């Protein structure tokens, strides 16, 4: 009888060991699933990388506090004034004179105006009135016909339209303002957030040419790369080099990334961004003017597919490419896109861990 009890105890112990082993395996699988993911945001300057980071804060980090919104006030002031100066430069470059006499004085005032570096000092009321009046001048559409020949921020029409609100003494930037506010990214900025079962470390890297040598520090153990391309830049020139087409520059940069030895096992998520501006621009500025082998006319889907094909052509390493049409300033669009991005990252994580 003692032998029987000993055998039962032995079997029970064996079952307990098996159960513990299964529990450990489940926990290990869970840890592998809830893995740390390093995402590198790459792309040329003004392709929308920093806007994506801001959207992650809105979607995954409870948005901006009033204090954080206030922090962008000075940036918005500078953006508004810089856009006005860019418009004035273009009017002078193309010998376009405002039709309303008062706008000649507004141009002189705006061109010499300097934003107060103290963010607590409201914008001079004369600035917002002068900007609004100049933007409404009948001569301005003639300037915008030359938009591919001079540099102005994509957000210029937005800020011009909002000039009166921005010029209010009580002005606090909205999240929409923050998404469109532009500061040059220098160095590398990390954002951390949780997305379902994934702990994301997202790195926003400076897009200007002078910043690219710093990317090397982020290359190790990258899970995915989100490469941002501004579709609307097909007729634009670089801020750093006015005779270099921005889309061709993006293709060169993408070539160097996708075929790099650092990214042999990395999935590339391609954000074909600024689709809203792309849609507006195609009817008035044919894509075929800049890419003569394109024959799809102003159809936005055909044009986007053509540019995607151009990016696929340089993918000689045959990395998995996951393209998405995006509008980085639209929170609902980015929320939907990142739901798909999460699935892509999760599937690749499962494959890497051997679960799939």
UniProtKB/Swiss-Prot annotation:
Region (G1 motif): 38-51
Keyword Nucleotide-binding (UniProt): yes
Region ranges (Disordered): 1-21
InterPro entries noted in UniProt: Fungi_Gprotein_alpha (IPR002975), Gprotein_alpha_su (IPR001019), GproteinA_insert (IPR011025), P-loop_NTPase (IPR027417)
Residues covered by region (G5 motif): 326-331
Residue ranges crossing the lipid bilayer per the database entry: none
GO molecular function: G protein-coupled receptor binding; G-protein beta/gamma-subunit complex binding; GTP binding; GTPase activity; metal ion binding
Record's signal peptide: none
Database matches in Gene3D superfamilies: GI Alpha 1, domain 2-like, P-loop containing nucleotide triphosphate hydrolases
Region (G4 motif): 269-276
GO cellular component term, pick one: heterotrimeric G-protein complex
Compositionally biased spans, kind Basic and acidic residues: 8-21
Knocked-out gene: effects: Decreases trap formation following exposure to C.elegans; formed traps exhibit abnormal morphology with a single or half loop.
Region (G3 motif): 200-209
Cofactor: Mg(2+)
GO biological process, alphabetically ordered: adenylate cyclase-activating G protein-coupled receptor signaling pathway
Binding site for Mg(2+): 50, 185
Keyword field: GTP-binding, Lipoprotein, Magnesium, Metal-binding, Myristate, Nucleotide-binding, Palmitate, Transducer
SMART domains the record matches: G_alpha
Region (G2 motif): 177-185
Residues bearing a lipid moiety (N-myristoyl glycine): 2
Subunit structure, as described in the record: Interacts with ascaroside receptor GPR2; to activate adenylate cyclase and positively regulate nematode trap formation. Interacts with ascaroside receptor GPR3; to activate adenylate cyclase and positively regulate nematode trap formation. Interacts with receptor GIN3; to activate adenylate cyclase and positively regulate nematode trap formation.
Function, as annotated: Alpha subunit of the heterotrimeric guanine nucleotide-binding protein (G protein) involved in adenylate cyclase-activating ascaroside pheromone-activated G protein-coupled receptor signaling pathway. Binding of prey ascaroside pheromones to transmembrane receptors GPR2 and GPR3 leads to activation of the pathway and positive regulation of trap formation for nematode capture.
Family named by the database record: Belongs to the G-alpha family. G(q) subfamily.
Protein name per Swiss-Prot or TrEMBL: Guanine nucleotide-binding protein alpha-2 subunit
Organism for this UniProt entry: Arthrobotrys oligospora (strain ATCC 24927 / CBS 115.81 / DSM 1491)
Gene (name only): GPA2
């Amino acid at each position: 009888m003692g032998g029987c009890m000993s055998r039962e105890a032995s079997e029970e112990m064996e079952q307990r060991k098996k159960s513990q082993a299964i529990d450990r395996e489940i926990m290990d699988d869970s840890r592998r699933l809830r893995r740390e993911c390093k995402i590198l945001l790459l792309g040329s300057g003004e392709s929308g990388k920093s806007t994506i980071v801001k959207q992650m804060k809105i979607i995954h980090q409870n948005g901006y506090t009033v204090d954080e919104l206030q922090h962008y006030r000075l940036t918005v002031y500078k953006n508004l004034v810089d856009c006005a100066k860019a418009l004035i430069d273009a009017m002078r470059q193309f010998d376009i004179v405002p039709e309303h006499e008062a706008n000649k004085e507004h141009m002189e005032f705006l061109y010499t105006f300097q934003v107060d570096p103290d963010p607590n000092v409201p914008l001079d009321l004369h600035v917002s009135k002068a900007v609004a009046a100049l933007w409404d001048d009948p001569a301005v559409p003639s300037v915008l016909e030359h938009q591919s020949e001079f540099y102005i921020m994509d957000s210029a029409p937005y800020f011009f339209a909002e000039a009166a609100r921005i010029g209010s003494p009580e002005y606090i930037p909205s999240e929409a303002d923050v998404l469109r506010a532009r500061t040059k990214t220098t160095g590398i900025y990390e954002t951390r957030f949780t997305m379902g079962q994934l702990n994301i470390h997202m790195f926003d890297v400076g897009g200007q040419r002078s910043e690219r040598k710093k990317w090397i520090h982020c290359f190790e153990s990258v899970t995915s790369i989100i490469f941002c391309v501004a579709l609307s830049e097909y007729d634009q020139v670089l801020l750093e080099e006015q005779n270099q087409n921005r889309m061709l520059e993006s293709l060169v940069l993408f070539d160097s990334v996708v075929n790099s030895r650092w990214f042999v096992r990395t999935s590339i998520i391609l954000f074909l961004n600024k689709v809203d501006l792309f849609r507006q621009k195609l009817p008035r500025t044919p894509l075929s003017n800049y890419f003569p082998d394109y024959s799809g006319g102003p159809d936005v889907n055909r044009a986007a597919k053509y540019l995607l094909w151009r990016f696929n052509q340089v993918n000689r390493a045959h990395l998995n490419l996951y393209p998405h049409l995006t509008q980085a300033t639209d929170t609902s669009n980015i929320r939907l896109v990142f739901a798909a991005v999460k699935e892509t990252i999760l599937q690749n994580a499962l494959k890497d861990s051997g679960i799939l």
